[in-house]
């Protein structure tokens, strides 16, 4: 019985997916401990909330634990995993622990290759504005709240559903969003795209008969699976056939303005405090959910207009000085797949028309670089200046002709932009300072250690 579990230990507690669950469990009154290879702002926050944090992994770290939570990034050879098995302590996958939390609430789960974090944040923000006090677990820090997780007293738990390891199939939400489906994390699915699409069908089919699948029909792969889903469906998009759709969409002062048409309801004029057509789609998904659960139109409009974004999702670091006496704009973004990168580049062009766009990119995983190589070359060639660094391996072994140098050579051969290759991420900030010009927009992108570059530039260049 659940009351027998009092102490829960997280291996890799500093990761964004693990830390959010740990914070909610702390707020539920559980004793929480965790280990990670290095301290960061996340582990420091959890320690202040009462978690016992260990630096490094050791068998002694799990002393007293009633359950041990792991992610797919944690190897079976991890000494804490080995010790837990020896002591017969239950080892719980991260997604299964999230599923247990979801059983305590009505779950709203957001799935899709791109846009999960922003969409989850938008849903949580609207429900919060509507007075529904949701619990949420997000894959990025909600800027307005200063955290990626919160225990609310309301009926709903809003969370990302991770398809990368197929663990979203543990979840049993009452509302499921699918933003899009692209070929990513294909190792999980035996490099079979049909298996990946079937997993999304299975995810939606886990809904109860009274649930709702909220699907973006602008995405061709989502449209393809739609006939296979037998649960109630609400569609959204720019497509005229969408039940929740955006019309009269325009870019104004770094924001998106549009009108939302909903079947049987009054039109809704919306200002979204984020740039990009992809973010309009994210907002439509959130509006569809909010409408379904009874949030007022006033709450929807206010939350979207005041939405301050999510950490590392088109996160603006303001203006910074250049060597020629001018200033450049600095933006940081988590995007690391060619499709989401193209959407973010388009958003940057829309937000800063006429400016030179400098992209600083660290590829994430050799397998993704290999599988999407030509698409990467195409999207990287759409910038005005390009700084490339070596692939962040995320535990993978190098793959021949799928490293940063190979990508730089291919972009150079394409002939549209001359890449600057920087081997070490620690040297990227200095390279950017040397090449940046007045009025440039510098967009730092990637899911690995590149995340340290924008803060380093922002801190160094601060007045």
UniProtKB/Swiss-Prot annotation:
Its EC number is 6.3.2.8. PANTHER family: UDP-N-ACETYLMURAMATE--L-ALANINE LIGASE (PTHR43445:SF3), UDP-N-ACETYLMURAMATE--L-ALANINE LIGASE-RELATED (PTHR43445). The gene is murC. This is UDP-N-acetylmuramate--L-alanine ligase. GO terms for cellular component: cytoplasm. Coiled coil: none annotated. The lineage of its organism: Bacteria, Pseudomonadati, Pseudomonadota, Betaproteobacteria, Nitrosomonadales. Signal peptide: none annotated. It comes from Thiobacillus denitrificans (strain ATCC 25259 / T1). It is found in: Cytoplasm.
